Amino acid sequence: MTYLLAPLVAWTVAQTAKVILYSVRAGRLNLRVLAVTGGMPSSHSAIVMGLTTAIGKHAGVASPAFAIALIFSFVVMYDAAGLRRAAGRQAAILNRLVEDLVHMRGVQEQKLRELLGHTPVEVLVGAVLGVAAGLIL
């Protein structure tokens, strides 16, 4: 059960922290952040590191399951901080180009979501939450 509980607790703590941080910043409760990707902390990092830590703690760091979970965690965190963040930057540039087209020709397009990935700090904080949940549970 710990293999499920640790990542779920890590995800819940990360998502709760995200709601609190964004609500304080906005000055009002903002539950919409629960349904979007990106932001502080990374719940993706929290959930995979919670699972990896629970496996390491209970099955051992020399187990095949730990090795698989660790590699999986690295892939997820690299994707969150690298690829999805780059896609978010590209979306920001495309949105500026579309704004220019609106002003020049009146072309109207839907804006792309820009907050897709995480900064390295957001990934690190999520990973720390996951490790903590895995060690505590």
Task: Please name every model-derived segment.
Residues M1-L5:
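Feature marks short, highly hydrophobic, charge-poor N-terminal signal-anchor/signal peptide-like helices
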Residues S23-R28:
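N-terminal glycine-rich anion-binding loops that anchor highly charged ligand groups
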Residues T12, T16-A17, L29-L137:
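Membrane-embedded catalytic cores of phosphoryl/pyrophosphoryl-handling enzymes
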Residues A6-Y22:
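N-terminal signal-anchor/start-transfer transmembrane helix
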